C-alpha cells in the first residue's frame, strides 16, 4: 500500500497550514476581532455551505470529496475499506500562532482501517481537522497558540495486535518501544522490517525519540464518529465526550479430559467447554452487578478443542474484554471473574491453566476547559448536544497521558462502524468540523 501515504502527503502539502508568520500583527483578527464570531451574542457565525458570504465556513462538498478519494486507497474492493499499518511514524502539520513559543493546541485522528470496514472512522478527524483550520484561515482568524494536526498510525490493532500504537508511543510507551524491536505480524514480518519496507524506519534503538513529554500540548481535541446509535436515535448533533472507558483484556484457558460424546456418561465428565460456558455467564453476572451501566464485558473469543461435534472438549480458550470509565470498579469486576474461574474449575474438576491479564489501560477523563469550550462552540452554532462516554478505544485515551484532552462525536448511520455500511452525513460532518474549528480557536487563545 504505497500510494495512500503519497495521497495524504500531497493533501498536506497542498493545504496551506503554516499560515501565520512571527511578524504578523497579533492584534489583527483575533477571536475577539473577526466578524462572524460574536462571543457575547451567539448568532450563527457560519454559513450552511462554503458558498455563503460568512467569514467562517466549512467546505463540506470538498471535504466529502476528500473522504471519498481517500476511501479508494484500500486493499479491498469498494465499498469496504482496508488500510493496515505501514509505518511507525506519525504525520504532523502545523499552523503557527502569533506566540509560537507557547505550547500548541493539537487535533487529529487516524486513517488506518481494519479489513472490510468503512471510510469514516478516524478519517473524519483527520480531514476534518485540516478543513477546520482552513476554515479559520479563510475567516482571517489568527491563533495565539499554534495549531497542529497529528495523523496517528495504527490506531487499529490489525497487523501487530496493538491498538493505538502511534499514540501509545507518543505518550512514552517505553515497554511498547522495546517490544516492537522483536514483534512480528501474522506473516512473521517484524515491525521494523515493515517500517523499513515503507521507507519510514528509524534505528532499532531510536523509537524512544518519538516520545513526548507531559504537557507537550496545551490541549488535544479529536473529532470522531460516535460508532454507536445514541446521537442518531436521539436526534442530537454533537456528543461532548466526558470520559473514555479503557478495556482490560484477559486470556483464560481450561483443561479437562476429552472423550467420545457417546461413551462417557455425564457424571464422569471433566468438560472444559462447560467450564468456559459457565464462566461466560459469570462474566455477564459480575458486569451487571457492578452497580453502573458504564461497566461492560464481552467474551469475544471462545475456542474449543478438538472442535468436533462428537467429542467432549478437552481444552477451552476464552478472551474477555472488560471496560469501564472507573478503573477501580473495572478491576474489582476482573477480580470477581478470576475468583469465579477458579471456583468453576474446582467444581467441574478441570484445570484453570491460565488466567492472564494481557492489557489493562487506565481510563481517561476529558479536561473541563475543553468540555466547556466545546459546549460553548455548540451553543454558538445552535447545535443540540449531550455529554457522552466513549466506550471505544481512541488515540485520545493515550494523548490524555501527556496533554489535556477532549473529544467531539458526530452521529453515524444506525451506529454502524467497522463495516462497509459505516456512514456519516455531509451535514453532520460539517457540524462537527464547525464545532472543532471554534473549539480550537477558543483553546488557542487561552
List each language-model region with its residue ranges.
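Active-site-adjacent substrate-binding region
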Residues: 57, 73-77, 89, 188-244, ...
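Classical eukaryotic N-terminal signal peptides for Sec-dependent ER targeting/secretion
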Residues: 1-9
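Alpha-helical metal-binding/catalytic segments enriched in His/Glu/Asp
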Residues: 70, 107-110, 116-156, 248-254, ...
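N-terminal hydrophobic or amphipathic helices/low-complexity stretches enriched
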Residues: 13-82, 311-312
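Acidic/histidine-rich catalytic neighborhood of metal-dependent amide-processing enzymes
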Residues: 114-116, 120-238, 284-311, 315-323, ...
Amino acid at each position: 500500500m504505497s500510494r495512500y501515504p503519497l495521497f495524504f502527503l500531497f493533501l498536506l502539502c497542498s493545504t496551506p497550514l503554516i499560515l501565520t508568520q512571527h511578524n504578523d500583527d497579533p492584534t489583527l483578527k483575533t477571536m475577539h476581532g473577526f466578524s462572524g464570531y460574536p462571543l457575547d451574542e451567539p448568532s450563527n457565525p457560519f454559513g450552511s455551505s462554503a458558498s455563503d458570504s460568512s467569514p467562517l465556513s466549512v467546505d463540506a462538498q470538498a471535504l466529502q470529496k476528500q473522504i471519498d478519494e481517500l476511501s479508494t486507497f484500500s486493499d479491498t474492493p469498494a465499498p469496504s475499506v482496508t488500510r493496515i499499518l505501514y509505518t511507525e511514524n506519525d504525520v504532523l502539520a502545523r499552523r503557527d500562532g502569533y506566540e509560537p513559543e507557547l505550547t500548541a493546541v493539537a487535533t487529529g485522528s487516524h486513517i488506518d482501517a481494519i479489513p472490510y470496514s468503512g471510510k469514516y472512522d478516524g478519517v473524519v478527524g483527520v480531514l476534518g481537522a485540516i478543513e477546520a483550520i482552513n476554515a479559520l484561515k479563510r475567516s482571517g482568524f489568527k491563533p495565539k497558540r499554534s495549531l497542529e494536526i497529528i495523523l496517528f498510525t495504527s490506531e487499529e490493532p490489525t497487523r501487530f495486535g496493538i491498538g493505538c500504537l502511534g499514540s501509545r508511543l507518543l505518550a512514552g510507551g517505553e515497554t511498547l518501544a522495546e517490544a516492537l524491536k522483536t514483534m512480528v505480524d501474522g506473516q512473521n514480518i517484524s515491525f521494523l522490517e515493515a517500517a523499513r519496507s515503507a521507507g519510514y524506519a528509524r534505528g532499532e534503538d531510536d523509537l524512544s525519540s518519538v516520545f513526548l513529554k507531559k504537557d507537550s500540548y496545551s490541549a488535544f481535541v479529536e473529532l470522531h464518529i460516535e460508532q454507536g446509535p445514541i446521537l442518531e436515535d436521539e436526534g442530537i448533533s454533537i456528543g461532548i465526550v466526558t470520559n473514555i472507558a479503557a478495556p482490560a483484556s484477559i486470556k483464560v484457558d481450561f483443561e479437562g479430559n476429552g472423550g467420545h460424546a457417546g461413551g462417557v456418561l455425564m457424571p464422569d465428565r471433566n468438560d472444559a467447554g462447560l467450564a468456559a460456558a459457565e464462566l461466560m455467564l459469570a462474566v455477564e453476572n459480575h458486569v451487571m452487578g457492578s452497580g453502573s451501566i458504564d461497566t461492560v464485558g464481552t467474551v469475544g473469543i471462545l475456542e474449543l478443542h478438538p472442535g468436533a461435534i462428537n467429542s467432549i472438549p478437552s481444552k477451552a480458550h476464552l478472551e474477555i474484554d472488560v471496560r469501564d470509565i472507573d478503573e477501580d470498579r473495572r478491576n474489582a469486576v476482573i477480580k470477581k471473574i478470576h475468583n469465579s474461574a477458579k471456583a468453576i474449575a474446582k467444581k467441574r474438576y478441570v484445570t484453570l491453566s491460565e488466567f492472564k491479564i494481557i492489557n489493562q489501560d487506565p481510563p481517561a477523563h476529558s479536561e473541563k476547559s475543553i468540555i466547556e469550550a466545546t459546549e460553548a462552540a455548540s451553543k454558538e452554532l445552535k447545535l443540540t448536544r449531550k455529554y457522552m462516554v466513549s466506550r471505544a478505544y481512541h488515540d485520545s485515551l493515550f494523548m490524555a497521558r501527556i496533554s489535556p484532552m477532549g473529544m467531539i462525536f458526530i452521529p453515524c448511520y444506525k451506529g454502524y462502524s467497522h463495516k462497509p455500511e459505516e456512514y456519516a452525513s455531509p451535514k453532520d460532518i460539517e457540524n462537527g468540523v464547525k464545532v472543532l474549528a471554534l473549539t480550537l480557536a477558543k483553546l488557542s487563545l487561552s
